[in-house]
């Protein structure tokens, strides 16, 4: 808990992996963690970003994130990647498209597979946002799978919803 609040990126990533885990024994640990961090959530601005492939979602996020950091803010990016319906894998390549932002000390970029979950997000995106809020990130940017048609859930869990075209 203290490691998350202090902004330790390695521990933040481990906490996210815990809530993303499908193992039964991890569910109890994840629920306990979420209960502990709950009082430290709700202070971030959550921005959902969607659009057709090639619309510039990653470019927008990198530019916005770097500007926010230059103004003394901390930025977390939750990049949801599509999962293959055949092998359940995903590309998880958004970090490579946001190279400059990824180098920033006050940035945290976490790619996550959608795992076939509809709504443009992963089934644990809300819990992942809570972890990033508890870690003190001022902005949490959620990059959806990016079709623009089914990203309705992200609009329900964010403060601002952007559609880029």
Each predicted region: which residue ranges?
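Hydrophobic anchor at the beta1->P-loop junction of P-loop NTPases
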Residues: 47-49
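Nucleotide-state-sensitive switch-loop elements of NTP-binding domains
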Residues: 2-45, 55, 64-150, 155-164
